[in-house]
């Protein structure tokens, strides 16, 4: 046995200072937390030594490393310590589904000696530890990156193939991020492709655009199964071409870093994508791009710079909201204007392909501005729960009003019928991109209330009727948006064959399906028959639709197959173990951690809480005699704890 020590970075800043990115003064309660009257929480200091068994067979070491890299990690910074019970169940827009996180929890519980099927059996072999959900008849599949095994070389890619990838980009990401006109990209490819004398900036930019185009495919059996490795190859080539791009301050550097962010998001590298998007914004602010300075006397270049800033700003605002991280755009930076002359392009060629639509971009900018507003309102620790509910409902109405008052009526249509087959393909693509943005934004607005209501029901926490009604409205709205977004993506792609960044679009479907999963698991006893039938129909239809997606993507969405859903539902709601003579479900077991860490359940500070102590994680029960005046602050603390779980 050889011990391999790997140091782990220790942050001595408290959570609030870390989020604000300010120096923490330390102490029992740091200066910043005193200033804002907030709870000062430090990470547990620790060092971890990883032990690895190996013999002289180097291939086994490589296989073990690859397998470890394929295990999904949580976004939450509080999950660095395996001994921590602060499990994040549901990250904001993480590609990690509820199924993946439950699997991680089960493996961890087994590692700690809590085998749900065999009480008292603490000797868990490494093979059993990795099984997780396989014990219950579910085989968890993860997305594998085959880029390392892919023979990537520019010499193997013809000019015809390159042009096809360029067109794939124009048919997909050019719509939400229209920085270049189509003719500009074709000119870039002509002067750069396999040209040794071309500038490194042009080469890197072209490689990134080709990477984005490479990840596009169709939701059918004829789609190309090697798209993801090719996209990864171009992305890595771009990084090698401009290794010091982050030290530059120029328009070229901003374009390259921005497309790095989009490409990384396209490949599922959420953390990298978020990092690059913030870097692109900071670069833009540093050179004054947000002030629309005249970097060139050419009018075409001026409009392109405007499109660059608007695209960078709206993408960073949207993406930071999705991954549940703060936006790096300062509050004093105004919302970018969307001038009609900069965002109106009739298209390329006689058929007007790859046009730029002003109204589409105007809506995207408005939605991105709502993202920061939602983030600040929902996750504000200075607002009580009832006012948060009212404010969020008002923001939702503002989003609806702006969207449905659009001058382009095609962008706001919801019905899908035979007319879609004769619809102009440019209009169809724009409609698809803006409507999934709208539906996803609505889903994200209400998802915290869906989860919080489940926590409240599990803990049997008392709450005023108006708060419970508000939570129910938000929960029901979230479920409806999840149903709508799944139906829209599936039905439109069946009517109109469109190139899609499949892995990216699958994250929309996965987010919607995990919401439905969560709702089924937490409401199985009282869900109405008609709604249950509709949810199961949507889930089955989504699974059937995804079976036609290209090879590398199937693994990432197989966990929502019908048999897996039924198995998961049985696991969560079946009586499987006894805890202090009280029957609990797996769902109870998973969810009870939030009660342990909630400030509302501190028995040392309030005698009204009855504690039932045992070796297993402690469960707390509220005294029924507590009056509403005492319960409201407790519920508020419970709400803030839930937000911390969801968003950190």
Curated annotation (Swiss-Prot):
Primary location group: nucleus
Cellular component aspect of the GO annotation: nucleus
InterPro entries: Fungal_SecMet_Regulators (IPR051127), Transcription_factor_dom_fun (IPR007219), Zn2-C6_fun-type_DNA-bd_sf (IPR036864), Zn2Cys6_DnaBD (IPR001138)
Keyword Transcription: yes
Domain of life: Eukaryota
SUPFAM superfamilies reported in the protein's UniProt record: Zn2/Cys6 DNA-binding domain
GO biological process per UniProt: DNA-templated transcription; regulation of transcription by RNA polymerase II
Keywords linked to the UniProt accession: DNA-binding, Metal-binding, Nucleus, Transcription, Transcription regulation, Zinc
CDD domains for the chain: fungal_TF_MHR, GAL4
Role according to the record: May be involved in the facilitation of anaphase progression in mitosis.
Subunit structure: Monomer.
Stated name of the protein: Zinc finger protein grt1
């Amino acid at each position: 046995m050889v011990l391999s020590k790997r140091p782990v970075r220790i942050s001595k800043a408290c959570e609030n200072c870390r989020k604000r990115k300010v120096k923490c003064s330390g102490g029992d309660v740091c200066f910043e937390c005193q200033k804002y009257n907030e709870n000062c929480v430090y990470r547990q200091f620790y060092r971890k030594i990883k032990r690895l068994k190996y013999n002289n067979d180097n291939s086994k070491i490589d296989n073990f490393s690859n397998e470890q890299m394929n295990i999904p990690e949580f976004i939450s910074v509080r999950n660095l310590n395996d001994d921590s019970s602060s499990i994040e169940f549901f990250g904001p827009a993480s590609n990690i589904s509820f199924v993946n996180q439950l699997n991680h929890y089960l493996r961890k519980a087994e590692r700690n000696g809590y085998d749900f099927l065999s009480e008292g059996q603490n000797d868990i072999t490494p093979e059993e530890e990795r099984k997780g959900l396989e014990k219950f008849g579910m085989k968890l599949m993860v997305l594998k990156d085959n880029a390392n095994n892919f023979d990537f070389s520019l010499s193997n890619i013809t000019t015809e193939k390159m042009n096809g990838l360029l067109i794939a980009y124009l048919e997909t990401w050019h719509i939400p991020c229209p920085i270049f006109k189509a003719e500009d990209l074709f000119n870039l490819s002509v002067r750069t492709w396999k040209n040794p004398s071309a500038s490194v900036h042009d080469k890197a930019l072209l490689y990134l655009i080709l990477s984005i185009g490479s990840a596009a495919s169709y939701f059918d059996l004829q789609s190309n199964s090697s798209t993801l490795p090719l996209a990864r190859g171009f992305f890595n080539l771009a990084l090698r071409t401009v290794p010091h791009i982050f030290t530059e301050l120029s328009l070229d550097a901003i374009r390259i870093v921005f497309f790095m962010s989009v490409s990384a998001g396209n490949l599922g590298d959420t953390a990298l994508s978020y990092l690059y998007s913030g870097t692109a914004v900071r670069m833009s602010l540093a050179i004054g791009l947000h002030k629309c300075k005249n970097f060139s006397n050419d009018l075409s270049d001026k409009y392109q710079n405007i499109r660059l800033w608007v695209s960078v700003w709206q993408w960073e605002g949207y993406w930071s909201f999705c991954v549940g991280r703060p936006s790096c755009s300062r509050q004093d930076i105004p919302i970018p204007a969307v001038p009609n002359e900069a965002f109106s392009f009739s298209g390329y060629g006689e058929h007007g392909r790859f046009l730029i639509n002003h109204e589409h971009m105007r809506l995207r900018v408005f939605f991105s501005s709502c993202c920061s507003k939602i983030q600040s309102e929902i996750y504000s620790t200075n607002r009580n729960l009832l006012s948060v509910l009212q404010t969020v409902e008002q923001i939702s109405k503002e989003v609806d009003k702006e969207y449905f008052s659009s001058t382009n009526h095609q962008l706001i249509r919801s019905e899908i019928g035979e007319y879609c087959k004769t619809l102009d393909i440019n209009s169809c693509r724009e409609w698809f991109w803006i409507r999934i943005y709208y539906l996803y934004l609505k889903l994200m607005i209400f998802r915290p209330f869906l989860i919080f209501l489940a926590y409240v029901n599990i803990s049997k926490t008392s709450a005023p009727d108006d708060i419970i009604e508000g939570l129910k409205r938000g929960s029901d709205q979230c479920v409806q948006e999840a149903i709508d977004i799944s139906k829209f993506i599936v039905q439109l792609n069946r009517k109109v064959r469109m190139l899609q960044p499949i892995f990216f679009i699958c994250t929309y479907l996965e987010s919607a399906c995990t919401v439905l999963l969560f709702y089924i698991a937490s409401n199985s006893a009282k869900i109405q028959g008609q709604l249950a039938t509709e949810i199961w129909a949507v889930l089955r239809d989504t699974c059937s639709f995804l079976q036609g997606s290209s090879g590398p993507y199937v693994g990432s969405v197989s966990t929502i197959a019908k048999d897996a859903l039924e198995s998961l539902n049985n696991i969560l709601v079946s009586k499987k173990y006894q805890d202090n003579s009280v029957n609990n479900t797996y769902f109870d077991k998973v969810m009870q951690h939030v009660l342990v860490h909630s400030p509302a359940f501190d028995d040392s500070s309030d005698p009204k809480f009855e504690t039932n102590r045992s070796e297993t994680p402690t469960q707390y029960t509220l005294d029924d005699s507590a009056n509403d005046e005492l319960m409201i602050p407790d519920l508020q603390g419970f709400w803030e704890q839930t937000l911390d779980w969801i968003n950190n």
